[in-house]
From Swiss-Prot:
UniProt enzyme class: transferase
Disruption phenotype: Cells are unable to grow on dimethylsulfoniopropionate (DMSP) as sole carbon source.
One GO MF term attached to the UniProt entry: lyase activity
Enzyme Commission number(s): 2.-.-.-
Source domain of life: Bacteria
Organism: Marinomonas sp. (strain MWYL1)
One Pfam match: CoA_transf_3
Note: At least 10 million metric tons of volatile dimethyl sulfide (DMS) are released into the atmosphere annually by the dimethylsulfoniopropionate lyase in oceans. It is a component of the tangy aroma of the seaside and functions as a chemical attractant that guides various marine animals, such as sea birds, invertebrates, and some mammals, toward potential food supplies. DMS oxidation products act as condensation nuclei, causing water molecules to coalesce, with possible effects on local climate through enhanced cloud formation.
Coiled coil location: none
Annotated protein name in UniProt: CoA-transferase/lyase DddD
Function: Dimethyl sulfide (DMS)-producing enzyme. Acts both as a transferase and a lyase: uses acetyl-coenzyme A (acetyl-coA) and dimethylsulfoniopropionate (DMSP) as substrates to produce DMS, acetate and 3-hydroxypropionate-CoA (3HP-CoA). Mediates the CoA-transferase prior to lyase activity. DMS is the principal form by which sulfur is transported from oceans to the atmosphere and is a key component of the ocean sulfur cycle.
Catalytic site: D602 (nucleophile)
Entry keyword set: Lyase, Transferase
Disulfide bond annotation, renumbered to this chain: none
Length: 837
């Protein structure tokens, strides 16, 4: 392995015209990875006035330029002439109207990579010109009306959350698109014009909120889902209290009060070993066995053929056993403090964690020791704790853990910095007349990946890469680790574009299959803690001995660039939501709630892992260096909480919008009833004069209680009226749509196309899905290059469907394959049915 310890994007130059969160954050990610970034603000400074700008603009040189003047435009164009990448996040067409035309720029400089990050897609005729703030995109995209089963049962619709999820997904997706374009440019010399709409990124990120499986068997429906169906069919009001709601939760997937009065989130459903370990450390396993706790040997046969009533490791459990186990677990958790249980679960390899606030998370020993939180010494805030990098490289991350504060420079200094970097760059790509014409191929055509991952985050990383042409072999064990809900139902999203093989790699023959696969691929990826690497033969020395050129990517739960006390703890999305403060903010510390449905952090962790893999591919193509890339759910939660995940001496209190009663950030950024429904107004004090000029809002500037004023006035007219009036005044406002509404109006039967031409929303219906069910899911459409191809990926195939094909491709004979199948070293399925009934 090349020991040269240089960040992979050293020499790459970026002009960052981004505002708000998403655009500047993409440039921040590139800067963290070594790129030289010049950030350009308008004369008044950043449009988002927030301490988090110190995070977004770290490792950057910043200056103000007035693009509305000829002198300012000339300066901007000169900076662009000296960079590889240009980033902007305005409404579609704004940069062109100011005199910066990305398409025209690439006609003279085809090597240039441009990234546009509008709130809504440029081909979305309805929404493209809206003032698309974070909350407006969220409201329009169904985020505030589909916030999980809890909120449905409590009758809370709409709900509000201050998490900038649209931007958080767009950061990983857009940074990945830049990395993909850089990788392609090393081969062809060509850049690309790329668009990543925040709304489309949000829809992909929250894909588990929107996918539908028709005629889903009852065994997969939770007690909450069944109660929702019951109330809807019998016209019963959704009015379940928080306390009542707890009794609809599975015992292995809920919050418990501990001896210190604080709460602990247990998340070990669907995995037989995790649930059993939990019951044993709680001291109630033997008691439950004595009371007749049933056991089902094979969960992948139809439920009508089970040899027992249920089994631990089944999610959801039937109510009878759920109630019995929950009562015993409640009493057991009261015997120790939440911190004590955190250590017991973590050291015992059981998923679970104490609920904590974001302030506690940012200042925790583990986050600071592991590099998940870093310290930046700046002039404005002094020593500021900030999120660490979202991707890093094993044994090479120290340079990423000491970010430099934002540096304010003159135009001349910024230009000189870019030119000095250009002078020493070692160019290895085609240039000038050698730049190749656009091929129309995928960025990852020919790249082969061995996917050893499970659940959501890991599999999502490679599913994401399949749209760009990557060839993915998904390798799973012959005996499944998870029940069919997590092990199969979730894979309808994460298994797309892959061939599936089942092999027991812990046997001698299976190990040989694994080694042949490693020799045949470019990347190996797994989600697992570091302690599992050597036993699995995935440590650096073992993998290099098999294939010295193979890249490696690992995702985990609590991992950071350095080792911390929780580095080897296992867990899921929900655990990091609980431990990092997301749940305490969403529901309040005393009544925490899961945020949205599934995959809120998982999916973004997958996107971040893909970013890391593509950066590794780029670095290898450019320098020949082979590396091991990392990310974690903990790193990703910090990006999702950029407005909150920081601290410094004198910081304002952590008192952001929180709880079920929160309907906005403040009176001018808030949900209000109209006489026909709801609207979300997202304004601020600087727009009071414009608000006062709107018919019906005259006098708001003099109001002593703006919230009450707006409640009184907005309810007098329809939502349509207010949307028209606010749009005319260029004030951000939107009607909250539901996911069902968006699906109904933006779905089509799968047509082998990607919905990049369909605006901000696109879903495909698969009536002939391999599962035998009709599936509707969001398109892989958020990344929209002008030249590279995005392909419509194949639906998830049945597990083991390609086992024989994969073994044949590795050179095994028919008799070899039959022998492995007979010995159960390999298998062609986990059960008769794809999704067991």
């Amino acid at each position: 392995m090349n020991k040269q310890n240089q960040l992979p994007l050293v020499g790459v130059r970026v002009a960052d015209f981004g505002q708000q969160i998403a655009g500047p954050a993409v440039a921040m990610v590139l800067a963290d990875l070594g790129a030289t970034v010049v950030h350009i603000d308008p004369p008044g400074g950043p449009s988002w006035k927030h301490p988090a700008n110190a995070i977004l603009n770290r490792n950057k040189a910043s200056l103000c330029i007035d693009l509305k003047t000829q002198a300012g435009l000339d300066q901007a164009l000169e900076l662009i002439e000296n960079v590889d990448i240009v980033i902007e996040s305005f409404r579609p067409g704004v940069m062109k109207r100011l005199g910066i035309d990305f398409v025209a720029l690439r006609e003279s400089r085809p090597e240039l990579i441009t990234l546009s990050m509008p709130g809504f897609a440029s081909n979305d005729e309805l929404h493209r010109d809206w003032k698309a703030t974070e909350a407006i995109v969220a409201a329009t995209s169904g985020t505030f009306t589909d916030m999980g089963f809890n909120r449905v049962l409590m009758g809370l619709n709409p709900s509000f959350s201050p998490l900038p999820l649209g931007s958080s997904y767009a950061i990983s997706l857009a940074a990945s698109s830049i990395a993909l374009a850089l990788f392609e440019r090393e081969k062809t010399g060509r850049g690309d014009n790329i668009e990543v709409p925040i709304a489309a990124a949000l829809m992909e990120g929250l894909s588990y909120n929107s996918y539908v499986v028709d005629q889903l068997p009852e065994r997969y429906k939770t007690m909450r889902e069944l109660e929702i169906e019951h109330r809807k069919s019998n016209n019963i009001k959704m009015d379940v209290s928080y306390a009542q709601l707890q009794e609809y939760l599975d015992p292995f997937y809920r919050t418990y009060v501990c001896a210190d009065g604080r709460q602990f989130y247990c998340v070990c459903p669907s995995h037989r070993n995790h649930a059993e370990r939990a019951l044993k450390v709680l001291g109630i396993y033997d008691e439950l066995v004595a009371e007749g706790l049933p056991e089902v040997k094979d969960l992948h046969v139809p439920i009508s053929e089970w040899d027992g009533e249920t089994s631990i490791g089944v999610y959801p459990l039937p109510k009878k056993w759920a109630d019995l186990i929950s009562e015993k677990m409640k009493k057991a958790f009261l015997q120790k403090t939440s911190d004590e249980w955190g250590v017991i679960f973590g050291e015992g390899q059981i998923p679970g964690a104490p609920h904590r606030s974001t302030e506690e998370w940012v200042n925790s020993e583990h986050c600071n020791a592991s590099g998940l939180i870093v310290e930046v010494e700046g002039t404005e805030f002094g020593t500021m704790k900030q999120p660490g990098p979202i991707v890093w490289f094993e044994n090479e991350s120290e340079a990423m853990l000491k970010p430099k504060p934002q540096e304010h420079v003159s135009f001349e200094q910024a230009l000189a910095r870019l030119q000095s970097v250009a002078k020493i760059e070692k160019i290895s790509r085609p240039t000038g007349q050698d730049i190749q014409p656009a091929s129309g191929k995928g960025w990852l055509d020919g790249v082969k990946i061995l996917d050893l991952t499970n659940v959501i985050a890991g599999p999502h990383s490679t599913a994401f890469m399949s749209r760009f042409g990557a060839e993915i072999t998904k390798l799973d064990p012959v005996t499944p680790l998870y029940d069919p809900l997590i092990g199969i139902l979730f894979t309808f999203q994460t298994g797309v574009g892959k061939q599936s093989a089942l092999v027991n790699i812990m046997t001698k023959e299976g190990r040989e299959v694994f080694e042949r696969l490693v020799r045949s691929v470019d990347i190996v990826v797994i989600n697992a803690p570091d302690r599992q690497m050597k036993p699995l033969g995935l440590d650096q020395d073992s993998l290099s001995a098999i294939n010295p050129d193979v890249l490696f990517c690992r995702l985990d739960c609590f991992g950071g660039p350095r080792t911390g006390s929780k580095t080897n703890y296992i867990g899921y999305d929900d655990i990091i939501q609980a431990n990092s403060g997301i749940m305490s903010r969403f529901g309040k510390p005393e009544t925490p709630e899961e945020h949205a449905h599934l995959g809120t952090l998982d999916v973004n962790c997958g996107f971040a892992a893909a970013l890391g893999m593509v950066i590794a591919l780029y670095q290898k193509r450019k320098t020949g260096k082979v590396c091991r890339v990392r990310t974690s759910l903990s790193a990703v939660t910090n990006i999702a909480q950029i407005p909150f995940a920081f601290d410094y001496e004198g910081r304002a209190p952590f008192n952001e919008a929180s709880g079920r009663e929160a309907m906005g950030n403040h009176a001018l950024s808030h949900f209000y009833r109209t006489n026909s429904g709801w609207v979300f107004l997202d304004s601020h004090q600087g727009e009071l004069a414009k608000l006062d000029a709107i018919k019906g809002l005259n006098g708001i500037q003099q109001s002593q209680d703006m919230g009450q004023f707006l409640r009184d006035q907005l309810v007098k007219e329809s939502s349509a009226y207010w949307l028209k009036e606010f749009a005319a005044a260029d004030i951000a406002c939107a009607e909250p749509f539901s996911i069902e509404y968006l699906r109904e109006h933006n779905s089509r039967v799968a047509d082998q196309k990607v919905g990049t031409d369909l605006g901000s929303y696109a879903f495909s219906i698969f009536p002939d899905h391999p599962s035998g069910h009709c599936i509707t899911q969001v398109d892989p459409y958020s990344i929209r290059p002008r030249e590279a191809k995005i392909r419509a990926v194949t639906p998830t195939e049945k597990f083991g469907c390609s086992t024989i094909k994969v073994l044949q491709g590795l050179g095994y004979s028919e008799s070899d394959i039959n022998d492995m199948l007979e010995k159960k070293i390999a298998a062609t399925g986990w059960g008769r049915e794809f999704l067991p009934s």
